[in-house]
Amino acid sequence: MALIDAIHAREILDSRGNPTVEVEVLLTDGSLGRAAVPSGASTGEFEAVERRDGDKKRYGGKGVLDAVAAVEGIAEELEGEFAADQRAVDRAMRDLDGTPNKGKLGANAILGVSMAVAVAAAQASDLMLYKYLGGPNSHVLPVPMMNILNGGAHADSNVDIQEFMIAPIGAPSFREALRWGTEVYHALKTVLQEKGLSTGLGDEGGFAPSLESNRAALDLIAEAVTKAGYRLGEDIALALDVASSEFFDKGSYTFEGQQRSAEEMAAYYTELVDNYPIVSIEDPLDEDDWEGWQHLTAQLGDRVQLVGDDLFVTNVERLQRGIDEKAGNALLVKVNQIGSLTETFDAISLAQRHMFHCMISHRSGETEDTFIADLAVATNAGQIKTGAPARSDRVAKYNQLLRIEEDLADAAVYAGRSAFPRFRG
């Protein structure tokens, strides 16, 4: 079994032009693993700490040279360890850090090493990464939750909801799902142009026009679905990322120009689900509004997927609380929220044991790294959120999923409508 021979890190740029950490791990058999760490725009209060330099003279204080230096310290600890023993590798880094939120070394340093070790070990095993991570039963291709219209923190517009997504639930394969979603994306551009609206792009490749309301965004997408030749609700469903913590303050939500309670937000979402084929709502309420989440889950949880992103931050302790209190029914998985691969697997395992679906997710600040595509298939998650079919940092993940589907051949199963509560029975 190959041992870790050397670890090297560098500062590179992400899709927003901000620095991030890239790590390379070399094994004694010559295998090389490389991984780059993503970064979010709307971040949960309880996420693991991303280490930035704070030197305003470099990249406005967003440099990551300190995190790069931290990797050099990690290297001294890990050289000579078995690359295939991922849990021991990650535990050694957590012990070296010694803080509950990875604040000493930085989650971006630890995660970069964690991912690169796995990539190197997969190469040493002569396996594609998804097979190495998930084993012989990894075969489910995820529904691409394609963010084609942006608002909130991902765009400069007056739309409160951060992401409006399409989900090609009726497609027979991932390849066809990607085609369907891409055709709707192009149709949406035409619809926007015909109405004299902006076709500028947000952080994740979706369009970011200035619209009068959130419903107007949904209606535009519905028009685009029809224009592309698909049936709304049968072929293509809708999904939202509200990112409500961004407009929650002092117990209320500033939404569409009004102050609303959690109960009023729940009534609003119920009306949307009644009128649109929405299969998933992410972060509909604030990360600390546990009572509101319980109320919303009781009211809507059997009809729609209620996804905890800022609520759970891929953290087993917060997820366990959600399970116990019946707050939410699905987990958004972001590897950099928790900061190591094994802790990510622990969160996914806990969710799946309790019938919570998992949606593997990118961040708004991405790179050409395709790790999460393999992770989605390795865990049979059934859903992936990695932006619009535009910009190479987003498309890279979709292209990797095409390769994986081709590798699986007849064993590949596309999750489709079975991934969502709205269509179960």
UniProtKB/Swiss-Prot annotation:
Q: Name one GO biological process term.
A: glycolytic process
Compartments where located: Cytoplasm; Secreted; Cell surface
**Record InterPro entries:** Enolase, Enolase-like_C_sf, Enolase-like_N, Enolase_C, Enolase_CS, Enolase_N
Explain how, and how many, cofactor molecules are bound.
Binds a second Mg(2+) ion via substrate during catalysis.
Q: Where is the active site?
A: 204, 334
- Binding positions for (2R)-2-phosphoglycerate? 162, 334, 363-364, 385
EC number(s) on record? Answer: 4.2.1.11
Q: What family, per the record?
A: Belongs to the enolase family.
Quote the NCBIfam families the UniProt record gives.
eno
The record describes the protein's role as: Catalyzes the reversible conversion of 2-phosphoglycerate (2-PG) into phosphoenolpyruvate (PEP). It is essential for the degradation of carbohydrates via glycolysis.
Name it. Answer: Enolase
Q: Gene for this protein?
A: eno
